[in-house]
Swiss-Prot record:
Function: Necessary for efficient RNA polymerase transcription elongation past template-encoded arresting sites. The arresting sites in DNA have the property of trapping a certain fraction of elongating RNA polymerases that pass through, resulting in locked ternary complexes. Cleavage of the nascent transcript by cleavage factors such as GreA or GreB allows the resumption of elongation from the new 3'terminus. GreB releases sequences of up to 9 nucleotides in length.
Keywords: Coiled coil, DNA-binding, Transcription, Transcription regulation
PANTHER family in the record: TRANSCRIPTION ELONGATION FACTOR GREA (PTHR30437), TRANSCRIPTION ELONGATION FACTOR GREB (PTHR30437:SF6)
Name of the protein this chain belongs to: Transcription elongation factor GreB
Similarity-based family: Belongs to the GreA/GreB family. GreB subfamily.
Coiled-coil ranges from the UniProt annotation: 53-75
Length: 158
């Protein structure tokens, strides 16, 4: 499945900050370190030079990716019409059949973070939640079988 191009404003800002940091701060420092290491002579056995060149390639790869990705991402802001229903950017309190409740936020694929309970809009759970309301039931097929979840609460960061 293709990645969606949706992102929250805070997610877009974080990627933009990362791009600026890599281009304006990190890359010049690494470039200088590579130049200094190259001036020491034999480059074939110069660990600082080899590591610096590798790091420079990593930075350049990430800069290219971020530059292209930021051009196609579509920022989705909160709108009052979303209240009461699950849409992109929503926080949702879900309860399983055992009565355990967990909170998830639906975000773009570039910003999902399991440690924060941020799930990608492209995930099966998020897809099942879109357009649903409080007290609705969703069914999600998982590797361990069908899971039924109940929506207890929906809120948005404004």
């Amino acid at each position: 499945m293709a990645k969606s191009n949706y992102i929250t404003r805070s997610g877009w800002n974080a990627l933009d900050q990362e791009l600026k940091f890599l281009w304006k701060d990190e890359r010049p420092k690494v470039t200088q370190a590579v130049s200094d290491a190259a001036a020491l002579g034999d480059r074939s056995e110069n660990a600082e030079y080899i590591y610096g060149k590798r790091r420079l390639r990593e930075i350049d790869r990430r800069v290219r990716f971020l530059t292209k990705r930021l051009e196609v991402l579509q920022i989705v802001d909160y709108h009052p019409k979303q209240e009461g229903k699950v849409f992109f950017g929503a926080w949702v309190a879900l309860e399983n059949e055992a009565g355990e409740e967990k909170h998830y936020r639906i975000v773009g694929c570039d910003e999902f973070d399991p440690a924060k309970n941020w799930i990608s809009i492209d995930s099966p759970v998020a897809r099942a939640l879109i357009g649903k309301s409080i007290d609705d039931e969703i069914k999600v097929e998982t590797p361990s079988g069908l899971v039924i979840l109940y929506i207890n609460q929906i809120w948005y960061e404004k």
